[in-house]
UniProtKB/Swiss-Prot annotation:
Keyword RNA-binding annotated: yes
PROSITE patterns in alphabetical order: RIBOSOMAL_S7
Taxonomic lineage of the native organism: Bacteria, Bacillati, Actinomycetota, Actinomycetes, Mycobacteriales
InterPro entries reported in the protein's UniProt record: Ribosomal_uS7 (IPR000235), Ribosomal_uS7_bac/org-type (IPR005717), Ribosomal_uS7_CS (IPR020606), Ribosomal_uS7_dom (IPR023798), Ribosomal_uS7_dom_sf (IPR036823)
Family matches, as SUPFAM superfamilies: Ribosomal protein S7
Protein name (record): Small ribosomal subunit protein uS7
Ribonucleoprotein in keyword set: yes
Family membership noted in the UniProt record: Belongs to the universal ribosomal protein uS7 family.
Subunit structure comment from the entry: Part of the 30S ribosomal subunit. Contacts proteins S9 and S11.
Functional note: One of the primary rRNA binding proteins, it binds directly to 16S rRNA where it nucleates assembly of the head domain of the 30S subunit. Is located at the subunit interface close to the decoding center, probably blocks exit of the E-site tRNA.
Keywords, alphabetical: Ribonucleoprotein, Ribosomal protein, RNA-binding, rRNA-binding, tRNA-binding
Annotated Gene Ontology cellular component terms: small ribosomal subunit
GO terms, molecular function: rRNA binding; structural constituent of ribosome; tRNA binding
GO-annotated biological processes: translation
Length: 156
């Protein structure tokens, strides 16, 4: 195991179009096979579709969607004796943002619309309105944590 401690976080460069590190993170989550320009095109077009449908700044829509998807609690496996318990723990802010973006992208890819632009735009709009599969994942995560609250004293 490394002895130097955790690797330092690398600074996120602000997105050139919207000037937001969240958009940069979203582009990096969409990225497949190193095709960054394709990922950027998908994200920018999806944000434009969101702007047309809502009439508001797409970064505000993205932030609202993330706030509705970010989990506050999650469960972690902890082995005590011969049993494995699902122990509820609070989610660190950076991890909650990362999870929210990951869920948005994952559930966008599973949607039925024709293009990825439409899928991402509609998942963002659904999430900003408190609907959609990503918001359901957050609810399920919170339910799991609530159901296993009895094991909270095993926290580390």
């Amino acid at each position: 195991m490394p002895r130097k401690g955790p690797a330092p976080k690398r600074p996120l460069i602000n997105d050139p179009v919207y000037g937001s590190p969240l958009v940069t993170q979203l582009v990096n989550k969409i990225l497949l096979d190193g095709k960054k320009s394709t990922a950027e095109r998908i994200v920018y077009e999806a944000l434009e579709v969101a702007r047309e449908k809502t009439g508001t700044d797409p970064v505000v829509t993205l932030k609202r969607a993330l706030d509705n998807v970010k989990p506050a609690l999650e469960v972690r496996s902890r082995r005590v004796g011969g049993a494995t318990y699902q122990v509820p723990v609070e989610v660190r802010p950076g991890r909650s943002t990362t999870l929210a973006l990951r869920w948005l992208v994952t559930f966008s890819r599973q949607r039925r619309e024709k293009t990825m632009v439409e899928r991402l735009a509609n998942e963002l709009l659904d999430a900003s309105n408190g609907l959609g599969a990503a918001v359901k994942r957050r609810e399920d995560t919170h339910k799991m944590a609530e159901a296993n609250k009895a094991f909270a004293h095993y926290r580390w």
